[in-house]
A protein has these predicted regions:
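Conserved SGNH/GDSL esterase-like catalytic core that processes O-acyl groups on lipids
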Residues: 1-63, 74, 152
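Generic hydrophobic alpha-helical scaffold/packing signal
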Residues: 31, 66-73, 112, 162, ...
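Alpha-helix N-cap and loop-to-helix initiation/capping positions
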Residues: 56-64, 99-106
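Aromatic/hydrophobic pocket-lining residues that form the small-molecule binding cavity
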Residues: 61, 65, 69, 108, ...
Length: 185
């Protein structure tokens, strides 16, 4: 059913998952999958439900995710891997004001470290959203691009951020091709 050319997307959505469960998929199954559907890019976007208000140390998240990235890299050696950092998530402070949950920024640091330690690409969705308090702006946009839980984007928000990610990937490809052309001159 897939076309011979173009982009084909497979989505392994596991709501509320940290992504660590991917490390438990047997290697034989992943290698069979790679033989049938070899991927060019694997995007890992997990962790939003890992973040919590007082979260400072997310080693318990990062260390198992290192194993997940290594597991996927072994199963899909031809594929590039992109880690998408968590987006903005709000909580109400002691005065009842919406604020970016401090644990979000700490988790992003751990996700960046995960990407660096595994030599994996990283895209900062929090910054792409607009940083501090951006989910509030997405909720209040007309039409709304996020849910009133001030945590989850909706389909419009997903489409908006997908467009930003696409432009980022295309810009990266353009820069790569320019560099390769320069190196061959």
């Amino acid at each position: 059913m897939d076309p011979e050319s173009g982009i084909v997307v497979d989505n392994f959505s596991t709501r509320g998952s940290s992504g660590q469960q991917l490390g438990n998929i047997p290697m034989k199954i992943l290698r069979d999958y790679n033989r049938l559907r070899p991927y060019d890019l694997i995007v890992l976007q997990y962790g939003l439900n890992v973040a919590f208000e007082g979260g400072v140390n997310y080693s318990y998240y990062k260390n198992p995710m290192i194993k997940v990235v290594e597991h996927l890299r072994k199963a899909f050696p031809q594929a590039s891997i992109l880690i998408v950092g968590v987006g903005d998530r709000e909580y109400r402070d002691e005065d009842g004001n919406l604020r970016t949950m401090p644990g979000v920024k700490n988790l992003i640091r751990y996700q960046q470290a995960l990407a660096a330690e595994t030599h994996t690409a990283f895209w900062n969705m929090y910054e792409a959203m607009g940083g501090e308090g951006s989910i509030v702006d997405m909720v209040n946009s007309k039409p709304s691009m996020a849910n009133y839980d001030y945590t989850h984007i909706n389909f419009r928000g997903g489409k908006h951020l997908a467009g930003i990610l696409f432009e980022t990937l295309m810009y990266g490809m353009e820069q790569y091709e320019k560099r390769k052309a320069y190196e061959t001159e």
